[in-house]
């Protein structure tokens, strides 16, 4: 007799998905579609030849900082944008704000996401969501549930 594996009480439950959702971002998308990039920043990036998400991912962060020459756009900020864009391009269905939250919690790619504990990561993202940066990114959207985070993790594994 095969006994069904019991999940611990209250364990995070990822959505059972036969078909994964589409990626929310692709390399050929305009750079303004990338997480954290608004119209003003997109213009600054376009001025140094970064027109698409693919261009952003290829950009040398230190060179970008020098070329853009805006106090608030450091090499680290560029690396964060790149990590957010990479997550949105490689984890099916991941929204911009979710990618921003993950990078803020030092989850910078799908491989790192695939190894995370849903409960701990959910708590970290929720705490970031209370910060000024988190509130700007998250807006009025509800915080992700532990099941949402478990779903991101499962999608990252596929």
Q: Where is each model-derived feature located?
A:
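C-terminal extensions
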Residues: 1-158
């Amino acid at each position: 007799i095969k006994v069904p594996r019991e999940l611990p009480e209250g364990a995070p439950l990822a959505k059972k998905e036969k078909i994964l959702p589409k990626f929310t971002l692709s390399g050929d998308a305009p750079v303004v579609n990338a997480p954290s990039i608004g119209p003003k920043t997109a213009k600054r990036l376009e001025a140094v030849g970064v027109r698409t998400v693919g261009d952003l991912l290829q950009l040398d962060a230190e060179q970008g900082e020098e070329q853009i020459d805006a106090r608030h756009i450091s090499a680290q900020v560029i690396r964060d944008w790149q990590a957010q864009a990479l997550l949105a391009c490689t984890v099916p269905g991941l929204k911009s704000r979710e990618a921003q939250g993950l990078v803020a919690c030092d989850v910078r790619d799908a491989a790192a996401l695939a190894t995370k504990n849903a409960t701990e990561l959910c708590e970290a993202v929720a705490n970031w969501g209370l910060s000024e940066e988190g509130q700007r990114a998250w807006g009025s959207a509800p915080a992700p549930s532990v099941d949402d985070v478990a779903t991101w993790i499962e999608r990252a594994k596929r």
